[in-house]
């Protein structure tokens, strides 16, 4: 949300621009990571789903146990519980009949203030979860007691390369070890009993802006890991390492490299034919595998989701057109060798950041009277796809949110029919969905009881325009998109725009390709999903509420206030005969950092927490007593309209990805610059150009901001803060408190008694 005094009709009614969909974030303050206590974890017996008595084995997981996961439903042994990534729990003790008695049984405050996106793993009574900056925690899954923690000590300066917050989506467990990818590109194997390092591999080139936020998958003894960084100009790939010793087994690049060099394999030689120009490889090409994977043991096939191009703008990336394989594609590989099997491209010649890295689900279902083995995905581009996972053959696709970039998917070719209104090379175009997508990384779920897929949907629009001054810079993001687009210029337009920023939970019939029911949410960027045999769908919401809905009708049947926005997906497990529902809560990610949308008032806490619920749980969260700070008086800085315009351009191109569009940060982990103290104002240039806060993650921007630019940037931030103050003194704040109240205040701290579950301590 941008209070923009330059394009406003008056200085009082400043422009409020919602830069919805910018998927870039990463610099800012560091978290205070929890104690690396490395206390020995109590080993749990193999039937820990029903017995928490310690034995000599810890995390004794292998492929056969995961394949046979339904025989021990009390464990959550893999990222999606099973290799098919359905995220469905066969446990039914907690059901639509008993959920009224569901209560909190323990919680543990993480002490972190950045986004938390992890799916915990629970094996034989021990929960393994991850936090921001790639920290790993092991807890007693029954009591929440911290058993050990591991901090990879990622240099905070590397956070500037994390497009979408310094998040981590989880660990993997295999034969007594815990595996995690770190934000600076390492793959680390830990001893599951105490968190000590067994081996570590640097999976990326440290001279390029690679990151890892996705969870590893372990298949046939290989740890599979991808990476991110397409916004910064990298070449995507996925790599397999031996789980035993960390030796590299194979690597599959998703886009071709330098055409003067030999192609790594036949698949890349074919892919190169779909690219145009002779310099695409110099900007990396993109195609990072930053999140979703799935595995079919019967077919021995690994499925990877491939991301966007670098830059986003295809007219710059590949002048002359082309599909640009394997961008925005589902690619099937042999997990033992990395050999290409087939691909299906959801968005040929991607031009809008429409990744295919979103959650993929494998299922067997009857379609058109025939039994089909399918892979399903709701990628960013707004269409829900059903693909034959044996051959890659297109089966069907329909829009699950409003779509403007294409009219439909051709049923004969499986390719989209693009709308002429989606091309922004010469004109500004407002397109839905925007770069955040109709659905982002937040996992879906499939229930075999209802045969429905449940989607945490977005569908926000975005204004696309070509950056005609684009020049590749390896130290910053390279999109080919013009960020300096005027937004709504009056309070009425501001309110109208904010009212569109919502999300919903959709139940989708993948055979009929139609929506069955919908739950509309008041806010956007809501959490991932869990379905259970108890006819329930669990979802955390951006408003700081954890909720359950009936899977067949979508009726809300249970809620619990958590006081911090939830974006991660829940899981379910059983210990000593009791079923638990657990979720990691912590606001952040791309939307939380970048969108500039005021956070929901109920999403008031800065710090994250892990929570576990069971029938009869009696624990009560302390009611947060938040101290709210009004916008402070600003220093007197003189600047011309030209200087303010330059400051705005510098902010939009370099700062809003961390500090929020319109200088509004809705997450607690990165400062909202409108609230700077007098001392920070005095130190402005030392921070921006001198790198005074590098150890906090705020690196020097002297490579793109000169001395005068620093002054212009400072003046712009102050002018926006003053315009914010003016707007907040109008009746609009009173009339639309749900939209504007938290645009005018920020939470300083929870002034209640520190919870016993605070980082490094015990759980409650």
Question: Language-model segments: which ranges?
Answer:
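Short, conserved, GDST-rich strand-edge loop motifs in beta-rich repeat architectures
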Residues: 225-237, 277, 304-324, 428, ...
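Flexible coil segments in periplasmic/lumen-exposed cytochrome c-class electron-transfer proteins
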Residues: 625-645, 649-654, 661, 696-764
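Extracytoplasmic beta-rich repeat domains
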Residues: 108-119, 149-172, 200-215, 253-292, ...
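Blade/loop signatures of beta-propeller domains
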Residues: 48-104, 258-269, 416-419, 494-495, ...
């Amino acid at each position: 949300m941008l209070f923009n005094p330059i394009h406003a009709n008056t200085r009082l009614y400043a422009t409020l621009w919602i830069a919805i969909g910018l998927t870039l974030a990463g610099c800012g303050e560091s978290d205070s990571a929890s104690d690396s206590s490395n206390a020995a974890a109590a080993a749990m017996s193999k039937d820990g789903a029903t017995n928490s008595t310690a034995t000599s084995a810890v995390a004794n997981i292998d492929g056969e146990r995961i394949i046979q996961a339904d025989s021990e439903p009390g464990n959550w042994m893999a990222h999606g519980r099973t290799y098919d990534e359905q995220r469905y729990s066969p446990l039914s003790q907690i059901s639509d009949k008993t959920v009224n008695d569901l209560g909190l049984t323990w919680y543990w405050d993480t002490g972190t203030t950045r986004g938390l996106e992890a799916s915990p793993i629970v094996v034989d009574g021990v929960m393994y979860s991850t936090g921001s900056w790639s920290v790993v925690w092991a807890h007693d899954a029954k009591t929440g007691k911290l058993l050990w923690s591991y901090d990879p000590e990622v240099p905070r300066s590397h956070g500037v390369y994390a497009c979408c917050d310094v998040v981590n989506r989880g660990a993997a467990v295999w034969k007594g070890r815990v595996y995690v990818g770190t934000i600076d590109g390492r793959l680390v194997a830990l001893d599951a009993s105490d968190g000590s390092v067994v081996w570590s591999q640097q999976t990326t080139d440290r001279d390029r802006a690679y990151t890892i936020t996705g969870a590893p998958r372990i298949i046939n003894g290989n740890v599979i890991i991808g990476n991110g960084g397409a916004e910064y100009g990298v070449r995507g790939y996925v790599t397999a390492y031996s789980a035993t010793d960390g030796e590299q087994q194979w690597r599959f690049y998703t886009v071709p490299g330098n055409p003067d060099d030999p192609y790594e394999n036949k698949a890349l030689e074919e892919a190169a034919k779909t690219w145009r120009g002779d310099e695409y490889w110099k900007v990396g090409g993109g195609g990072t595998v930053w999140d979703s994977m799935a595995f079919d043991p019967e077919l021995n096939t690994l499925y990877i989701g491939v991301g966007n191009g670098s830059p986003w703008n295809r007219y710059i990336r590949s002048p002359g057109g082309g599909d640009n394989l394997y961008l925005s594609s589902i690619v099937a590989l042999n997990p033992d060798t990395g050999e290409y099997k087939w691909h299906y491209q959801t968005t040929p010649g991607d031009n809008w950041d429409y990744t295919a890295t979103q959650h993929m689900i494998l299922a067997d279902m009857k379609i058109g009277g025939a039994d089909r083995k399918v892979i399903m995905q709701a990628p960013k581009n707004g269409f829900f796809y059903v693909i034959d996972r044996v051959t890659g053959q297109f089966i069907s696709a329909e829009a699950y949110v409003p779509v403007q970039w294409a009219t439909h998917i051709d049923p004969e070719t499986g390719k989209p029919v693009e709308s002429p209104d989606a091309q922004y090379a010469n004109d500004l175009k407002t397109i839905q969905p925007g770069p955040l997508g109709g659905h982002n990384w937040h996992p879906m779920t499939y229930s075999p009881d209802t045969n429905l897929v449940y989607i945490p949907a977005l569908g926000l629009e975005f204004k696309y325009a070509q950056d005609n001054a684009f020049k590749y810079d390896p130290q910053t993001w390279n999109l080919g998109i013009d960020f300096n687009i005027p937004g709504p210029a009056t309070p009425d337009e501001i309110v109208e725009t904010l009212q569109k920023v919502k999300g919903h939970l959709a139940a989708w019939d993948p055979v009929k390709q139609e929506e069955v029911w919908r739950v509309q949410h008041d806010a956007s960027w809501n959490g991932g999903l869990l379905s259970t045999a108890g006819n329930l769908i669990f979802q955390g919401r951006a408003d700081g509420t954890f909720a359950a809905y009936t899977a067949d009708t979508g009726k809300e049947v249970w809620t619990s206030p958590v006081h911090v926005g939830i974006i991660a997906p829940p899981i379910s497990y059983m210990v000593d005969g009791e079923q638990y529902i657990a979720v990691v809560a912590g606001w952040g990610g791309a939307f939380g950092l970048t969108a500039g949308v005021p956070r929901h008032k109920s999403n008031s806490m800065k710090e994250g927490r892990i929570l576990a619920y069971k029938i009869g749980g009696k624990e009560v969260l302390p009611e947060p007593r938040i101290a709210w700070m009004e916008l402070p008086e600003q220093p007197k800085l003189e600047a011309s309209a030209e200087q303010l315009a330059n400051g705005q351009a510098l902010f939009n191109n370099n700062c809003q990805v961390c500090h929020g569009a319109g200088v509004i940060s809705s997450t607690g982990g990165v400062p909202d610059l409108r609230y700077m103290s007098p001392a920070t104002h005095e130190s402005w240039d030392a921070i921006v150009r001198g790198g005074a806060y590098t150890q906090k993650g705020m690196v020097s921007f002297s490579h793109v901001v000169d001395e005068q630019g620093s002054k212009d940037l400072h003046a712009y931030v102050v002018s926006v803060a003053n315009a914010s103050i003016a707007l907040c003194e109008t009746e609009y704040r009173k009339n639309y408190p749900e939209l504007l109240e938290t645009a005018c205040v920020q939470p300083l701290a929870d002034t209640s008694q520190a919870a016993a579950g605070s980082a490094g301590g015990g759980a409650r």
